[in-house]
Swiss-Prot record:
UniProt record similarity statement: Belongs to the class-I aminoacyl-tRNA synthetase family.
'HIGH' region, short sequence motif: residues: 129-139
Molecular function terms from GO: arginine-tRNA ligase activity; ATP binding
Reactions catalysed, as given in the entry: tRNA(Arg) + L-arginine + ATP = L-arginyl-tRNA(Arg) + AMP + diphosphate
Matching Gene3D superfamilies: Arginyl tRNA synthetase N-terminal domain, HUPs, Isoleucyl-tRNA Synthetase, Domain 1
Domain of life: Bacteria
NCBIfam families xrefs: argS
Main location (coarse class): cytoplasm
The species this protein was found in: Geobacter sp. (strain M21)
Name of the protein this chain belongs to: Arginine--tRNA ligase
Length: 554
């Protein structure tokens, strides 16, 4: 609807240029927004205020000229009014709103989708947890966010690839190997002083037990270096397989798993450093190599290779992002924990050093999750330092509830996740409230058929949908494509959870005030069934893009 209105306003402005009522000139970007109060119309624009200086007229005078041109010029517009310093308020005809229902029915599963990203290739890299332990709930929020952003971008027409970056080249892998070896020796009877720097979780004992079952005491007889290398590989593989399974159980599947170690094995770290040196962006000082990130607004230059010759994580990130763009992605999106916010300027510097625009790298920061039970905080970790895992949360509340709750707030704001609320089958539980709306509609259709009313949608009389509840529900349906597009380009899946709760609220309000199946008014019955058919399509599409099911019975 907004796009149609923008086109109408543009045509009106061009008409005023043509007839001389306005001086020809550049047309500003036409903003069309929904007013805060319904009495100010369905939409409003400030275009008259934007054009006033160019036209050398008062904003209200420009608005009067435009209103005169637009009045009666479109079958969208019922009436117009000028408000305040020069806003133009639009009241849309009921018939124009009702036409949305035919669009929804025709589009079906494609309702809401757009082609704004057509021809553009995007990579979303998310989770990317070290393969040194199971995923915790913070990773779960990152997984839900990254997966939903990828789905939103796909719905907006982008060609999207989901990628997991395996941090398998750092010192943490040696620590993992040592942890596994010590637990293995302990299990075979050796008295071990287990260092605090090693991984404390019980999963390390599981890895050791697996090694004993498969290999007996073989690794008691090898050097520590060989034992650490073995348990680093075995432990990493087992943990990564567990991570993959937990993510699949959570509804997340990656198109590509990328090993950090492969960057070293294939010489990509060295070649990336050499390229940046050739560009004058990496220099030597005190035996170390530094990247000139201050050239791009960072507060200080960053070390790439230490004076002892050991590369930093930053060196891997330079090579990794160089590799991403070399694979042909137009847009690269990283999903990080909020504790990495200080890392943003240096990565933006790398992207610019590669000759790309800083905006070609999108970074989504994901804040912490606090667990509650009926409003009371839950301990997030055990005495041994094990965090509550994603698997534990999904097993307790279910995949749908977990995903919805993780996506209920902006990713960069802290999230309270109430486990008891997430399990509650009541309207207090937002995911239940939304899913129940979909199931309730399916139940209404079952009831209609039981009463001998078969939905017949080939000649629906939409004009019978005229109550405030009818029209309010239709208006809420009509904004879904705009919500979806905004969620995609701004990386904000919480816009969809907000919208779903609002749409479910409109539906439940409609249902409580309106009779759907009215035997004495068969045409109105068919019109309202069609309206609910469109609500069900929209609920299902919006839930699906978040990776959440739309149950037909609850």
């Amino acid at each position: 609807m907004k796009e149609q209105l923008r086109a109408c306003i543009l045509k009106g402005i061009e008409g005023c240029f043509a007839d001389g009522t306005l001086t020809s000139g550049e047309v500003p970007a036409i903003n069309v927004e929904k007013p805060a109060h319904a009495e100010h119309g369905d939409f409003a624009t400030n275009v008259a205020m934007q054009m006033a200086k160019q036209q050398r007229k008062a904003p209200r005078a420009v608005a009067e000229i435009l209103v005169a041109k637009l009045a009666g010029a479109s079958d969208l517009i019922e009436s117009l009014e000028i408000a305040g310093p020069g806003f133009i308020n639009f009241f849309i005809k009921d018939g124009a709103w009702r036409r949305t229902l035919s669009e929804i029915d025709r589009a079906g599963d494609a309702w809401g989708k757009s082609g704004i990203g057509r021809g553009k290739k995007v990579q979303v890299e998310f989770v990317s947890a070290n393969p040194t332990g199971p995923l915790h709930i913070g990773h779960g929020r990152g997984a839900a966010t990254g997966d939903a952003v990828a789905s939103l971008l796909s719905a907006a027409g982008f060609d999207v690839q989901r990628e997991y970056y395996i941090n398998d080249a750092g010192n943490q892998m040696n620590t993992l190997g040592l942890s596994g070896l010590l637990r293995y020796k302990e299990l075979l009877g050796e008295k071990i002083e287990f260092p605090e720097t090693c991984y404390q979780g019980d999963y390390m004992k599981d890895i050791a037990r697996d090694a004993v079952t498969k290999y007996g005491d073989r690794f008691l007889k090898v050097s520590q270096e060989e034992g650490v290398a073995f348990f680093s590989k075995m432990g990493g593989d087992l943990i990564l397989a567990g991570i993959d399974q937990d993510l699949q159980d959570f509804g997340v599947r990656f198109d590509h798993w990328f090993s950090e170690q492969s960057l070293f094995d294939e010489g990509k770290v060295n070649s990336a450093i050499e390229e940046m040196q050739a560009k004058g962006l990496i220099y030597e000082q005190e035996g170390a190599l530094w990247f000139r990130t201050t050239d791009y607004g960072d507060d200080k230059d960053r070390v790439v290779v230490r004076s002892n010759g050991v590369t930093t994580y930053f060196a891997s990130d330079i090579a990794y992002h160089r590799d991403k763009f070399a694979r042909g992605f137009d847009w690269v999106i990283d999903v990080w924990g909020a504790d990495h916010h200080g890392y943003v300027p240096r990565l933006k510097s790398v992207v610019q050093g590669l000759g790309r625009d800083a905006s070609d790298l999108g970074i989504i920061l994901v804040q912490l999750v606090s667990l509650l039970r009926d409003g009371v905080p839950v301990a997030m970790s055990t005495r041994s330092g094990e965090f509550v895992t994603l698997k534990e949360v999904v097993d307790e509340v279910g995949r749908d509830a977990a995903r919805f709750f993780f996506l209920m707030r902006r990713s960069d704001s802290q999230l309270d996740f109430d486990l008891e609320l997430a399990k509650r089958q009541s309207n207090d539980n937002p995911v239940y409230y939304v899913q129940y709306a979909h199931a309730r509609i399916k139940s209404i259709f079952d009831t209609a058929r039981e009463r001998g009313v078969e939905p017949l949608f080939d000649s629906v009389k939409f004009e019978l949908l005229q109550t405030p509840e009818d029209l309010s529900l239709i208006k809420k349906l009509s904004v879904y494509p705009e919500i979806l597009e905004g969620g995609a380009v701004n990386f904000e899946p919480h816009r969809i959870t907000y919208y779903l709760q609002e749409l479910a609220g409109e539906f439940h309000s409609f249902y409580n005030k309106s009779r759907v199946i009215t035997p004495e008014e068969p045409e109105l019955t068919q019109a309202r069934l069609f309206l609910l058919h469109c609500v069900a399509i929209t609920l299902k599409n919006a839930l699906t893009v978040l990776g959440i099911s739309a149950p037909e019975r609850m």
